[in-house]
Amino acid sequence: MRWMVGLSCLAACLSAAVPANCQEMRDGEALLTAMHDRYKDSWYESVVFKENAITLNPDGTSKTEVWDEALELPGKLRINRGPSSEGNGFVFADGTLTTFQKGKATGPRPYVHMLLVLGFDVYRQNPETTIDQAKGQGFDLTQIHEEKWEGQDVYVVGAAKGDLKSKQFWIEKKRLLFVRLIAQDEHDATKIHDTRFRDYRRLSTGWISARVEFYTNGKNTFNEDYFDMKANAKFDPALFDPTRFNETRIDSDAKQ
């Protein structure tokens, strides 16, 4: 009976553990808040992992490097591209980005890493901070609708239905996990970048996307495949200090 189904859903939505799919997301602010509230007491504080970084060239060839990454949430990410001895990588910290090439630094410059924000930080920082970051990066949080994405229901924030050019992010409805970001290139509006978080796996009491795919104008140009993932690793604070990049190393055997 329809009325019985309705009462069942009402009862579920009034229970202590209210599932997101029983809530009507009125806008992006409500969604970002729900993401935080779902995992605020369980999401890991840090993670260390290795990745196969795969560049897909226009001629059909590819190049693979092994990178080391360390995240401390919210807002800190250290990447070593290749062996630490080569001095190549990035440090994202305190809203800035410093790039290293053969040990020489460029930056820091202001930078909000929205993949870090939406894939990780959102669960470990105040919702108001995430909302301010998203607005500051040009996402229209008043725009929200639902889509089907690879067989799953998703929320799309920042664009109207059918618009795949405006800046937008996609969130899986069931688990409230980030799955896609679409945005124009900062320097060339004819290029549309599309980043996809795939292959979510349990990590401690949270989740991590073990594969990240990058597309430009529909063509897959770069992929990241994560392995040796460890949650709640303990890091030396100097690891995220750009001035000490060349004297610190990411320890894949960091204590948990």
Predicted regions and their residues:
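Gly/Pro-enriched, hydrophobic low-complexity segments
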Residues: 83-86, 150-246
